[in-house]
């Protein structure tokens, strides 16, 4: 397992839709035990308990992709060294947008929502987001995420009892506007999810997937990774058999967590940036 070096000693973990920073609790403990400083900043205004967000989801409804990216940009530029950036699901999309801004020593998209340009939209992805997409008015709402929704989207490889307990601990309503931004990016000429996939001066990128993922099926994740093949910068892809979208708590999560960290440490040490990027924001 990789350990901190003089070049990289911090990992920034970015949660996705339907989740908060609490979803990283197991990864934080595992990475911290290896000597890393692990940061799990929430989306803007969402740095409160799951229970409070369920009672008052106003901060969720206000989310916009551009604002989320600006929020993490400020955090990362304030660090003394470029960190490893990892994001899950829509957090993986945010990680790719940060990569496009020249940030990070290495970036990992864990079952990431795709950037603009990926044309594939699998039926299971649509089903996972149906509670949001079925009503255009949800674009301006925080949309509830039920136990049944969680079972299909996150708990499809675990028992109903464990899925329900995980829903109780982790799940929050989804930011409808963010989901609509991602789902219809290819129809929006000014989409906030657009990146320059051909740039070669970026940090290394790893995209991971799970063979049983309903939200971001492996076919969608691999299509996202393939967009970057026109760049000479490092782009890697890894699919984990039997894994769902629940990377934070599915039994065996340690395998993906360890692989992601090992890959990122090695890639970051080879990339070896010396300062946090001051590249202009897109």
PLM feature segments, named:
Residues 16-19, 89, 211:
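Active-site glycine-rich loops that stabilize anionic/oxyanionic intermediates
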Residues 66-83:
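Conserved acidic catalytic loop of the alpha/beta-hydrolase fold
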Residues 86-91, 95:
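Gly/Ala-rich beta-loop-alpha elbow adjacent to hydrolase catalytic centers
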Residues 104-139, 180-187:
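Flexible "cap/lid" loop of the alpha/beta hydrolase fold
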Residues 201, 207-209, 213:
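Short beta-strand/loop motif that positions the catalytic acidic residue
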Residues 214-223:
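Conserved alpha/beta-hydrolase "acid-adjacent" motif
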């Amino acid at each position: 397992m990789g350990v901190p070096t003089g070049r990289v000693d911090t990992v920034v973990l970015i949660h996705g839709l339907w989740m908060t920073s609490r979803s990283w609790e197991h990864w934080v403990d595992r990475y911290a035990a290896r000597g890393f400083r692990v940061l799990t900043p929430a989306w803007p205004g969402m740095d409160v308990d799951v229970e409070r967000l369920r009672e008052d989801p106003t901060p969720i409804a206000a989310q916009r992709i551009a604002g989320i990216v600006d929020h993490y940009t400020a955090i990362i530029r304030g660090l003394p060294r470029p960190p490893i950036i990892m994001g899950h699901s829509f957090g993986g999309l945010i990680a790719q947008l940060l990569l496009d801004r020249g940030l990070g020593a290495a970036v990992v998209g864990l079952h990431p929502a795709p950037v603009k340009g990926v044309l594939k939209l699998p039926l299971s992805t649509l089903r996972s987001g149906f509670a949001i997409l079925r009503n255009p008015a949800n674009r301006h709402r925080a949309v509830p995420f039920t136990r049944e929704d969680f079972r299909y989207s996150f708990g499809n490889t675990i028992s109903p009892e464990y899925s329900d307990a995980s829903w109780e601990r982790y799940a929050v309503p989804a930011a409808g506007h963010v989901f609509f931004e991602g789902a219809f990016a290819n129809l929006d000429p000014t989409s906030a999810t657009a990146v320059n996939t051909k740039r070669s001066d970026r940090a290394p990128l790893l995209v991971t997937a799970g063979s049983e993922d309903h939200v971001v099926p492996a076919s969608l994740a691999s299509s996202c990774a393939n967009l970057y093949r026109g760049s000479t910068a490092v782009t890697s892809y890894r699919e984990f058999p039997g894994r769902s979208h629940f990377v934070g708590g599915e039994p065996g999560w340690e395998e993906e967590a360890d692989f992601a960290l090992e890959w990122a440490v090695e890639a970051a040490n080879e990339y070896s940036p010396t300062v946090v990027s001051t590249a202009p924001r897109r």
